[in-house]
UniProtKB/Swiss-Prot annotation:
Gene name for this UniProt entry: murG
Catalytic activity from the UniProt record: di-trans,octa-cis-undecaprenyl diphospho-N-acetyl-alpha-D-muramoyl-L-alanyl-D-glutamyl-meso-2,6-diaminopimeloyl-D-alanyl-D-alanine + UDP-N-acetyl-alpha-D-glucosamine = di-trans,octa-cis-undecaprenyl diphospho-[N-acetyl-alpha-D-glucosaminyl-(1->4)]-N-acetyl-alpha-D-muramoyl-L-alanyl-D-glutamyl-meso-2,6-diaminopimeloyl-D-alanyl-D-alanine + UDP + H(+)
Key words of the record: Cell cycle, Cell division, Cell inner membrane, Cell membrane, Cell shape, Cell wall biogenesis/degradation, Glycosyltransferase, Membrane, Peptidoglycan synthesis, Transferase
GO CC annotation, single: plasma membrane
Pfam families tied to this protein: Glyco_tran_28_C (PF04101), Glyco_transf_28 (PF03033)
Function: Cell wall formation. Catalyzes the transfer of a GlcNAc subunit on undecaprenyl-pyrophosphoryl-MurNAc-pentapeptide (lipid intermediate I) to form undecaprenyl-pyrophosphoryl-MurNAc-(pentapeptide)GlcNAc (lipid intermediate II).
Protein name: UDP-N-acetylglucosamine--N-acetylmuramyl-(pentapeptide) pyrophosphoryl-undecaprenol N-acetylglucosamine transferase
Principal subcellular localization: membrane
Amino acid sequence: MSAQGKRLMVMAGGTGGHVFPGLAVAHHLMAQGWQVRWLGTADRMEADLVPKHGIEIDFIRISGLRGKGIKALIAAPLRIFNAWRQARAIMKAYKPDVVLGMGGYVSGPGGLAAWSLGIPVVLHEQNGIAGLTNKWLAKIATKVMQAFPGAFPNAEVVGNPVRTDVLALPLPQQRLAGREGPVRVLVVGGSQGARILNQTMPQVAAKLGDSVTIWHQSGKGSQQSVEQAYAEAGQPQHKVTEFIDDMAAAYAWADVVVCRSGALTVSEIAAAGLPALFVPFQHKDRQQYWNALPLEKAGAAKIIEQPQLSVDAVANTLAGWSRETLLTMAERARAASIPDATERVANEVSRAARA
């Protein structure tokens, strides 16, 4: 059956880890002739980002329940019901053939609305530990996929859809073989930065001296203070930027990455074929630890959990990796990646729409 005229509604919101993989799948299916709309919330990143990609977006009112107190919990059933009713009205008007839930609060009422209308629900879990919304929706979903093994016991492991410019990078052997001079260390704390990395890495630079050159993404509002920290450590030569717009270029430059281990970051690093030193964000589910673990087990990365993080721990780890070791780790990272994740997710969406 032709994809021409098929309609998809993507449900994803809140963070780049949910939105960017959804956009990758949306563009893949749009290139095949699908119509795509988005279900999101008006006060999160998808509200601005999705329309820039040429995709119309509908909004419902919903937010998270964690840490909101007893009053919010009492009001939650009514809020979820209202959001479900809004999503149901949107879907009755749009009539999607299938909905794709990529996570975020919006997927909960959106998935329930689709199910109540008899529309197939396809889920993708980006993290190594399933989010609360996807745990609930998995019971009614037509198909459940996961990026890393372990989030769901029987779900297919398909990887995370990542940006095409990252997938297009030369293989590690072509990129890294023959490199000389200081080891190029890319420090990434996510779009918000990571205070612990901003505090630690200037001191690491002082310990390692001329053996490294660092490109440090500080996050919003931190560039000046991080530059000052490098200068005070006697290392003013290192590059500090608030954001990195072209992550593919940054990955191509780097020999090794020091970063948090959000799901999309881990998947991009594997797809790029880069060794990594992961410092997982401390979360009660240890979500980022479980995201990073497959690459550590593959011999492509090392995890230092935040309570054990120190200047010496980072400096000694980086100093212990020769260029030969870094190339081996990079090749293992690339071998552990699933470069056709976007196509795999898109194929399951197509299959569910035909069922």
